[in-house]
Amino acid sequence: MPEVVINGPEGRLEGRYHHSKQENAPVALLLHPHPQHGGTMNNKVVYTLYHAFVRRGFSALRFNFRGVGRSQGIFDRGEGELSDAASALDWLQTYNPNATACWVAGFSFGAWIGMQLLMRRPEIDSFIAVAPPANMFDFGFLAPCPASGLVILGDQDQLVTADAVQRLVTKLMNQRDIRISHRIIPGADHFFQNHLEPLSQAVEQYIAGNQRKRAAVAGR
């Protein structure tokens, strides 16, 4: 799990990268929760997502947004963090020019940034949004949502409301050719304390199902 340095809009961005041994492996970018509330690339949920992708054969990158850890810059209320994510995706694609698929996955604030990146980068094939804070941030930019994905929430989440997430999922599911899987993890709070294993299982099941569908289409 080598440390990497990415040239970001405001200076260096600190990251951790796993390069798959598989030729032309798919890639995944992982985005951490709110920088001003202790969010880092080493967050347990982000770490869990990262290793779920690694186990499914992906080349995966997680990094610290500006002002977090050894990443340069200061918090920019989402706008700068979106630019950071775009730079990280550029880096990931530079080292994986023949990747068979491109995913973005984020937790909480990171899910909000990831969905915005999804709108700007048509090469992103799918997404995973864990506890997307639909009751705190505006997700109205998803009009229309350009890719299918997975939304996960714990039923004991104390920060993100189930009603707000359900409205977001319903909005996305009403769009043509977009398929949204919505998973509820029983007993899990916002940080999935003592529930990281069922989170990992849900993510890996979704990724595996997506990979099977892609393989079936390619084999026709």
Regions found by a protein language model. Name each.
Residues 6-96:
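Serine-hydrolase catalytic machinery in alpha/beta-hydrolase-like enzymes
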Residues 73, 188-200:
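Catalytic histidine-centered segment of alpha/beta-hydrolase-like enzymes
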Residues 85-147:
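Primarily recognizes the serine-hydrolase "nucleophile elbow" in alpha/beta-hydrolase
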Residues 155-160, 190-191:
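Acidic catalytic loop of the alpha/beta-hydrolase fold
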Residues 161-171:
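Short alpha-helix in the alpha/beta-hydrolase fold that links the catalytic acid
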Residues 172-191:
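Catalytic histidine neighborhood in serine/cysteine hydrolases
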Residues 196-220:
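Catalytic active-site module of serine/aspartate enzymes centered on a nucleophile-bearing elbow/loop
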